[in-house]
Curated annotation (Swiss-Prot):
It catalyses: an N-acetyl-beta-D-glucosaminyl derivative + UDP-alpha-D-galactose = a beta-D-galactosyl-(1->4)-N-acetyl-beta-D-glucosaminyl derivative + UDP + H(+); N-acetyl-D-glucosamine + UDP-alpha-D-galactose = beta-D-galactosyl-(1->4)-N-acetyl-D-glucosamine + UDP + H(+); a beta-D-GlcNAc-(1->3)-beta-D-Gal-(1->4)-beta-D-Glc-(1<->1)-Cer(d18:1(4E)) + UDP-alpha-D-galactose = a neolactoside nLc4Cer(d18:1(4E)) + UDP + H(+); a beta-D-glucosylceramide + UDP-alpha-D-galactose = a beta-D-galactosyl-(1->4)-beta-D-glucosyl-(1<->1)-ceramide + UDP + H(+). Glycans are attached at residues 57, 168, 339, 387. Residues 32-395 are lumenal. Mn(2+) binds at residues 199, 293. InterPro entries: Galactosyl_T, Galactosyl_T_C, Galactosyl_T_N, Nucleotide-diphossugar_trans. Its main location: Golgi. GO terms for molecular function: beta-N-acetylglucosaminylglycopeptide beta-1,4-galactosyltransferase activity; metal ion binding; N-acetyllactosamine synthase activity. It is found in: Golgi apparatus, Golgi stack membrane. Disulfide bonds join 79-121, 192-211. It comes from Mus musculus (Mouse). The keyword Transmembrane applies. Pathway: Protein modification; protein glycosylation. Responsible for the synthesis of complex-type N-linked oligosaccharides in many glycoproteins as well as the carbohydrate moieties of glycolipids. This is Beta-1,4-galactosyltransferase 3.
Length: 395
C-alpha cells in the first residue's frame, strides 16, 4: 500500500515540495533559528586562528584637536554605534610582560589617570573600568597593555581605576569593587561601570564595553579556562557591566566575602532579587584569556561562602554600598590608570580550615568541588526595596 501511495504523482510532488521548502529554510538561516530555539545563539562567526595585532588601527584614529594636522575644534557628531576601527579577534600574549614605560609609549593618546576621549566625535558611552588588585603587578601590566588599545578602537570615553587593597589580610574582591565604584563616581557621572578581574584579557573588540540599560551584563561568557563556554547559567564572574543606577538598585556587591569564592553567585542572586535580568553577548564575541597563576597567599578558599550564600535573600539590603566602610589611603593619577589604595579592614571571623580536600583557588578541581557542594538557592520571597548608597561625604 505504501508503495502504491508513493507512486502517486500528487504524493511525490508533496514530498519534493517539502524537501525544497526545508532546503530553502536552512539556506536562509534556519540553522541559526534552530540554535536560538534549542540553545544559546552563538552569534556571528569569527576566525580566532588568525587574530589581529592588539594595536591594529590605532594610527587611523583621528588626531585630537590642537594636534598637528587636526581640524579646528567644533561641535562634534556622535560617534557611530559601532566603531569603524574594530578588527575582531586580537592576539593575546603573556610573554614578554611589557614595562609600564613601554605601555605608555604605545598609548600616547591616553591621558593622566588612564583617561581617554575619542577625537572627531562625541562618545556614546563614558565607561569606568574598575580593577580590584593586590600583588598582581605582571597581570596588571598585561591587562593595561591589551585593554587600552582595545578600548580606544571602540571610540569610548573611558577611565581605568585600579583598586589596591592595603595590608596583608585576606583579599576581598567584592568590597574592593564597591570602593572603586564609590571613588570613580566622585570623579565623574559615568554611564557605565565595568568590573574587571586583573587576570582576564579580552580577545575580540566587538565585545563592546558599554552597558545595557535593560539590566546588568555579564561579559566574560567564554573563557579559555572553561573551554570557551559558560560554566553554569548563573555564573556572573570575571567581567561584568552595570549602570550606576543598576548597581545601586542591587545595593552594590557584598562586603562579607573574604577570600576566594561565593561572591559571584551572591551578586547574581542580588540581580534577581532586585527585579533585574542578566544579559550576555554572544559566545563567539565574549572571548577572554586568563593569565595563568598559582593560588595567592591571602586569597585562600572562603570557608564561609556557602553559609553566606544561603543568607543572601535576607542580607542583600543590609550588606553592600549602604554598609561600606573603608579608609582611603592614597589616590594617585598615573599615566595609565588611577590608583586607589584603601584600607578595607580584615575578616572579622578569622581563618577557619574548610572540610574536604584543598585545591588552589580558581583551579578546575576547586571549581568542580564547589559545584558538587553547591546548595540549591532559597526560594525567593517578596521583593524587598534596595537601600541606596550612603551620602557621598562618608566612607
Amino acid at each position: 500500500m505504501l508503495r502504491r501511495l508513493l507512486e502517486r504523482p500528487c504524493t511525490l510532488a508533496l514530498l519534493v515540495g517539502s524537501q525544497l521548502a526545508v532546503m530553502m529554510y536552512l539556506s536562509l538561516g534556519g540553522f541559526r533559528s534552530l540554535s536560538a530555539l534549542f540553545g544559546r545563539d552563538p552569534g556571528p562567526t569569527f576566525d580566532y586562528s588568525h587574530p589581529h595585532d592588539v594595536y591594529s588601527n590605532l594610527s587611523h584614529l583621528p588626531a585630537a584637536p590642537g594636534a598637528a594636522g587636526a581640524p579646528p575644534a567644533q561641535a562634534l557628531p556622535y560617534c557611530p554605534e559601532r566603531s569603524p576601527f574594530l578588527v575582531g579577534p586580537v592576539s593575546v600574549s603573556f610573554s614578554p610582560v611589557p614595562s609600564l614605560a613601554e605601555i605608555v609609549e604605545r598609548n600616547p593618546r591616553v591621558e593622566s589617570g588612564g583617561r581617554y576621549r575619542p577625537a572627531g566625535c562625541e562618545p556614546r558611552s563614558r565607561t569606568a573600568i574598575i580593577v580590584p588588585h593586590r600583588a598582581r603587578e605582571h597581570h596588571l601590566r598585561l591587562l593595561l597593555y591589551h585593554l587600552h588599545p582595545f578600548l580606544q578602537r571602540q571610540q569610548l570615553a573611558y577611565g581605568i581605576y585600579v583598586i589596591h587593597q592595603a595590608g596583608n589580610g585576606t583579599f576581598n574582591r567584592a568590597k574592593l569593587l564597591n570602593v572603586g565604584v564609590r571613588e570613580a563616581l566622585r570623579d565623574e557621572e559615568w554611564d557605565c561601570l565595568f568590573l574587571h578581574d586583573v587576570d582576564l584579557l579580552p580577545e575580540n573588540d566587538h565585545n563592546l564595553y558599554v552597558c545595557d540599560p535593560r539590566g546588568p551584563r555579564h561579559v566574560a561568557v567564554a573563557m579559555n579556562k572553561f573551554g570557551y563556554s559558560l560554566p553554569y547559567p548563573q555564573y556572573f564572574g570575571g567581567v561584568s557591566a552595570l549602570t550606576p543606577d543598576q548597581y545601586l538598585k542591587m545595593n552594590g556587591f557584598p562586603n562579607e566575602y573574604w577570600g576566594w569564592g561565593g561572591e559571584d553567585d551572591d551578586i547574581a542572586t542580588r540581580v534577581r532579587l532586585a527585579g533585574m535580568k542578566i544579559s550576555r553577548p554572544p559566545t563567539s564575541v565574549g572571548h577572554y584569556k586568563m593569565v595563568k597563576h598559582r593560588g595567592d597567599k591571602g586569597n585562600e578558599e572562603n570557608p564561609h561562602r556557602f553559609d553566606l550564600l544561603v543568607r543572601t535573600q535576607n542580607s542583600w539590603t543590609q550588606d553592600g554600598m549602604n554598609s561600606l566602610t573603608y579608609r582611603l589611603l592614597a589616590r594617585e593619577l598615573g599615566p595609565l590608570y588611577t590608583n586607589i589604595t584603601a584600607d578595607i579592614g580584615t575578616d572579622p571571623r578569622g581563618p577557619r580550615s574548610p572540610s574536604g580536600p584543598r585545591y588552589p583557588p580558581g583551579s578546575s578541581q576547586a571549581f568542580r568541588q564547589e559545584m558538587l557542594q553547591r546548595r540549591p538557592p532559597a526560594r525567593p520571597g517578596p521583593l524587598p526595596t534596595a537601600n541606596h548608597t550612603a551620602p557621598r561625604g562618608s566612607h
